[in-house]
Amino acid sequence: MLGADTNILVRLIVRDDDPQCRMIEELMVSERLFVSLSVILETEWVLRSSYRQSRIEIAAALTELTAVESLIFEARGDLLWALDRYAAGADMGDMIHLISNRDMPAFVTLDRKLSAQAGPDTPLPIRTLA
């Protein structure tokens, strides 16, 4: 298994460079690629800021990639939850922070909106200090 960089996911989603897409697809025939949560976070930022994609487009594209057999996503189940919350209006960074801390007893924040954005199925309790 190899670790995948952000540009790998971006190419697979936007498909704006045929030779690079072919190289990635050929590699994925023989290798599995690990996608970390930090790569997901940067991919969201690139798609939003450079490619002007909407949160709905981004969430749908990333969700679709989680079904690709040769892509192994860190905390896949939690990531799907985060993508669902992101599509509903939550901040992607905040959702990644929550799932990255899923083994902690609680997540502490000063952000009063975070609990509402995370919804009732958050992977850990959120404690707001304000």
Where do the model's predicted regions map?
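Short beta-strand scaffold positions
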Residues: A4, V35, F73, M92-M95, ...
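Acidic, PIN/NYN-like endoribonuclease modules and their adjacent C-terminal/linker elements
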Residues: R85, L98-A130
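Short, well-structured N-terminal submotif of metal-dependent ribonuclease cores
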Residues: M1-V35, S50-A60, D121-A130
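Short active-site oxyanion
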Residues: S30-L33, S70, R102-A106
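Alpha-helix capping/helix-boundary segments
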Residues: I8, V39, D78, I96-H97, ...
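Acidic catalytic patch
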Residues: L37, A60-A87
